[in-house]
Amino acid sequence: MSFIKEFREFAMRGNVVDLAVGVIIGAAFGKIVSSLVADIIMPPLGLLIGGIDFKQFAFTLREAQGDIPAVVMHYGVFIQNVFDFVIVAFAIFVAIKLINRLNRKKAEEPAAPPAPSKEEVLLGEIRDLLKEQNNRS
């Protein structure tokens, strides 16, 4: 089997394609969540606590000196990333909870009893014949 053919079979297997789709959708979902946090949640939250823009929260470790830029820790951006994480984690939690509930409902449905085997059918016929013989006597 050639290398290219093996690679094609690997790349087109169902679980690899599903994984690729999941990664692409996850990246798009991450952008949506980042926008939700940065553009929708943080502005009203900052307004509620006094018109604060969290992106501006920073701690300067060293001031700029000539051509050397300042060394700054932007902890406001970190706060936004924490909000991003919490929202993504909550969304995943809710999705998994729904999937588990659906799987539980499927598991609770009683399965149809299996069809009797040939031996069971023959034993049933023998039993019925013996009952008939006992009833005649």
UniProtKB/Swiss-Prot annotation:
GO terms for biological process: monoatomic ion transport. Gene3D superfamilies: Large-conductance mechanosensitive channel, MscL, domain 1. GO terms for cellular component: membrane; plasma membrane. The chain crosses the membrane at residues 10-30, 76-96. The keyword Transport applies. It comes from the Bacteria. Keywords: Cell inner membrane, Cell membrane, Ion channel, Ion transport, Membrane, Transmembrane, Transmembrane helix, Transport. One of its GO terms (molecular function) is mechanosensitive monoatomic ion channel activity. It is found in: Cell inner membrane. PANTHER family: LARGE-CONDUCTANCE MECHANOSENSITIVE CHANNEL, MECHANOSENSITIVE CHANNEL MSCL. Homopentamer. Channel that opens in response to stretch forces in the membrane lipid bilayer. May participate in the regulation of osmotic pressure changes within the cell. Belongs to the MscL family. This is Large-conductance mechanosensitive channel. It comes from Salmonella typhimurium (strain LT2 / SGSC1412 / ATCC 700720).
